[in-house]
Amino acid sequence: MKEYQTVTEISGPLIYAEVDEPIGYDEIVEIETPNGDIKRGQVLESEDGLVAIQVFEGTSGIDTNASVRFSGETLKMKVTEDLLGRVLDGSGQPIDGGPEILADERREIVGAAINPYAREYPEEFIQTGVAAVDGMNTLVRGQKLPIFSGSGLPHNELALQIARQATVPEEENADDNEDDGSEFAVIFGAMGITAEEANEFMEDFERTGALERSVVFMNLADDPAVERTVTPRMVLTTAEYLAFEKDYHVLVILTDMTNYCEALREIGAAREEVPGRRGYPGYMYTDLATLYERAGRIEGREGSVTQIPILTMPGDDDTHPIPDLTGYITEGQIYVDRDLNSQGVQPPVNVLPSLSRLMDDGIGEGLTREDHADVSDQMYAAYAEGEDLRDLVNIVGREALSDRDNKYLDFADRFETEFIDQGFEVNRSINETLEIGWDLLSMLPKDELNRVDEDLIEKYYREENAGETAEIAAE
């Protein structure tokens, strides 16, 4: 490696050095400080003999006497099946005290989006054990389904619940020698989290045994912002290897994408780039797409990469650039709701603004159950009507409502307390979720179930529940 002692400027997480040869974009750099410390960096820009380098460990201790060595290689991730059960820092180095990683291969972390022509359409169900997701906003293999949350809401608890409970149920009609649900892995990437949050994550992974099938990447709040731009790419490179080389169905959970975007803004400001909306880089949409579009399935490969990116909306504003741009790229969203959280509903998922655009392709007979779509549609309609009636009650009082309206109000209350509110430790199968759905729908008269096929009503409707509701209304 050719060595230079030509550092001319230090600006935030960046250093600038003069060179007399062409230097490649994203090339890895070693920086040796005057006291002998070695730091790693990456080339951000190279033009007219001046190179901008982002330093992973921060620029503390670096001055104009530092030595800079260019490797001629881009940043690579050591990948192997033995990564399962390991905990790494945000740049892919082990921090769990375990043995050194013996890689099967080293892969560049700047992967490409899956070729649209080679994509296989996502259509198999992933069971998260969370009724609000499985029953109402179903996740399918190869989908990218973000969770929109707010500051102080329990999105981390929801992420951990999904990480330890998520499975790919075996298809009912699968051949006996096929085990499509056996190879499932979770890659958990945390960016900009506090030490307290990191401890909570690790305690939960170890307590529940979920770590055995997981790879955990931890970038802490006091780690350099530059490392946060690397972490999700390390995560996705590992996921792609396990999915497309080792035939795993991989669920990638990234939290918090807001911290990632703040790191982009910080680096952009240090480079004196022209800012876009609210100071974020104008290329943030493209940058996010390079991450989200790495989810999917490839024809001829058994494995899949499914993404659940989690982001906190500043000021609970879903028009903020981060959730706004994320919504354009991904295939739906799950909303964590502040009002439901204040009522003690766990997890506080508001199903009305939530959406899974690929749900219809991953449910039904042979995937979940024949009545899944009808039950979901009817519960959406009934809950929405109950919500509208709550607004009316605030004006005219409940006494002014008809018996029919009171049944919808009761449905909305029980939908939140019995269907949505299951706690963070309860793992519901899809059958349990749908059975609870029928318990609630049976509060309503049969002629109100206009979104459910008559044959399904005859098969699943509980006459005794309708009778109980009538008695309560009479009292």
From Swiss-Prot:
- Give the main localization category: membrane
> In what way does this protein cross or attach to the membrane?
Peripheral membrane protein
CDD domains assigned to the protein according to its UniProt record, in alphabetical order: ATP-synt_V_A-type_beta_C, ATP-synt_V_A-type_beta_N, V_A-ATPase_B
The protein's GO terms of the molecular function aspect are: ATP binding; proton-transporting ATP synthase activity, rotational mechanism
Checking PROSITE patterns in the record gives: ATPASE_ALPHA_BETA
The reply to whether Ion transport figures as a keyword in the UniProt entry is: yes
Gene Ontology biological process terms from the UniProt entry: proton motive force-driven plasma membrane ATP synthesis
Q: Does the keyword field hold ATP-binding?
A: no
Question: Which Cys pairs does UniProt list as disulfide-bonded?
Answer: none
Assigned GO CC terms: plasma membrane; proton-transporting two-sector ATPase complex, catalytic domain
In terms of InterPro entries, this protein maps to:
ATP-synt_VA_C, ATPase_a/bsu_AS, ATPase_A1-cplx_bsu, ATPase_F1/V1/A1_a/bsu_N, ATPase_F1/V1/A1_a/bsu_nucl-bd, P-loop_NTPase, V-ATPase_su_B/beta
Cell compartment(s), UniProt: Cell membrane
Keyword tags? ATP synthesis, Cell membrane, Hydrogen ion transport, Ion transport, Membrane, Transport
Cross-referenced NCBIfam families: ATP_syn_B_arch, PRK04196.1
Oligomeric state and partners? Has multiple subunits with at least A(3), B(3), C, D, E, F, H, I and proteolipid K(x).
Instruction: Outline what the protein does.
Output: Component of the A-type ATP synthase that produces ATP from ADP in the presence of a proton gradient across the membrane. The B chain is a regulatory subunit.
Assigned protein family: Belongs to the ATPase alpha/beta chains family.
Protein name, entry field: A-type ATP synthase subunit B
